[in-house]
């Protein structure tokens, strides 16, 4: 039998792929930008062989909510500098561009980045270019302009970002018409919503979640602010009802939206976020320890989530939500050859939530990234 020859062969003592069911020692074989074989029985030679004897080999990580941008957004950071070297091969922008600047964003970020970048286009027509907030008045929430921009060129646009938090809306501005405009844009375009719900008592969560539809994603899910997922010490009934209707829940860590007590309470009740994301943006640059997706994943492990559940929610599950099942977030033959290599550091700095609470334990750290068959 003729021996197979590959461009790249990557070996590790543990491969994990929720999409194909892999969890054990093996190798991934790559030709061009495609995975052609994976698992324990992969044999053959390759032009380049990489061995990682003490690491975990995963599909390239998928960050469903962050801020990849180059100058177009008050939050933006370069995806090829701040995501790709940290194991993230696919990242979605939460509203860095809107109808007025989507063409510039596509030209300067989506089309020029080595990282795969998707966009949840902002309902605010200027995106995140305002130095303070999205919505200064209701005219900023232009459903028709948003839908028209998607209809004109929907490439790489996953859905629509609607954020009605206190930080996104001017003081005194009613968030309800903004949410209504987002839902209108979603109906006009046939796209899902990525929603930052109101986290203030002026609009209770129980009035917001029933507005959302199957496939819509709620982000900032594990915050300790008012109107979080809990009523008292338990998951609220309306949160369970939203999940049963098909509404999805994303982490969206950021600067304000990860609390260990909230995470621990939700996990203890069996309510796991659907996707693990960083909401990484320019305030995180040069943070110590560095905020990234592997560290965010490690925090959920420390909070009690099973490791396999965490790994799936940073790879296969967000890829599926983004419509990339079989292309990203997978080690199955035929998938794009995007890989992340992580190593567990038991001596890492303590894991800290946004309120300063710490949990001891190790942390996943990035070792290597492969994007489209090329080592980064």
Task: Describe these PLM feature segments.
Residues 336-376:
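C-terminal cap of metal-dependent C-N hydrolases
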Residues 43-44, 52-112:
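Metal-associated gating/positioning segment near the N- to mid-region
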Residues 1-44:
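N-terminal metal-binding scaffold of metallo-dependent hydrolase/deaminase domains
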Residues 76, 86-97, 112-138, 161-164, ...:
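Metal-cofactor-binding active-site regions of metalloenzymes
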Residues 261-344:
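His/Asp/Glu-enriched, well-ordered alpha-helical/loop segment
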Residues 13, 28, 33, 54, ...:
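Divalent metal-coordination and catalytic microenvironments
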Residues 166-287:
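Active-site core of metal-dependent hydrolases
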Residues 62-66, 91-93, 117-121, 158-162, ...:
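Hydrophobic faces of well-ordered beta-strands that scaffold small-molecule active sites
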């Amino acid at each position: 039998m003729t021996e197979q020859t590959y461009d790249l062969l990557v070996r590790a003592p543990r491969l994990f792929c929720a999409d194909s069911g892999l969890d054990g020692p093996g190798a991934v074989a790559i030709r061009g930008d495609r995975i052609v074989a994976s698992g324990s029985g992969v044999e053959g030679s390759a032009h380049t062989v990489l061995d990682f004897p003490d690491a975990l080999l995963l599909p390239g990580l998928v960050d469903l909510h962050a801020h990849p941008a180059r100058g177009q957004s008050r939050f933006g950071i370069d995806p090829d500098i701040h995501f790709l070297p940290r194991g993230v091969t696919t990242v979605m922008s939460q509203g860095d561009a809107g109808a007025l600047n989507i063409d510039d964003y596509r030209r300067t970020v989506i089309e020029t980045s080595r990282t795969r970048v998707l966009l949840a286009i902002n309902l605010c027509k200027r995106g995140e270019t305002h130095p303070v907030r999205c919505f200064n008045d209701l005219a900023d929430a232009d459903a028709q302009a948003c839908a028209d921009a998607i209809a004109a060129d929907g490439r790489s646009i996953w859905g629509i970002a609607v954020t009605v938090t206190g930080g996104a809306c001017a003081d005194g501005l009613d968030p309800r018409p903004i949410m209504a405009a987002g839902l209108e844009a979603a109906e006009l375009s046939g796209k899902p919503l990525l929603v930052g719900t109101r986290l203030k008592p002026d609009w209770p969560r129980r009035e917001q979640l029933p507005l959302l539809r199957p496939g819509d994603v709620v982000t900032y899910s594990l915050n300790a602010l008012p109107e979080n997922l809990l009523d008292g010490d338990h998951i609220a009934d309306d949160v369970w009802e939203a999940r049963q209707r098909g509404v999805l829940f994303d982490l969206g860590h950021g600067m304000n939206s990860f609390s260990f007590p909230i995470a621990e309470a939700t996990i203890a009740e069996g309510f796991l976020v659907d996707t693990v994301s960083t909401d990484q943006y320019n305030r995180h640059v040069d943070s110590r320890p560095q905020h990234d997706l592997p560290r965010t994943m490690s925090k959920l492990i420390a909070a009690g989530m099973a490791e396999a559940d965490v790994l799936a929610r940073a790879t296969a599950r967000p890829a599926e939500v983004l419509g990339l099942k079989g292309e990203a977030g997978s080690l199955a033959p035929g998938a794009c050859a995007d890989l992340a290599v992580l190593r567990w550091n038991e001596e890492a700095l303590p894991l800290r939530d946004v309120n300063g609470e710490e949990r001891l334990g190790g942390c996943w750290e990035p070792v290597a990234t492969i994007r489209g068959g090329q080592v980064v």
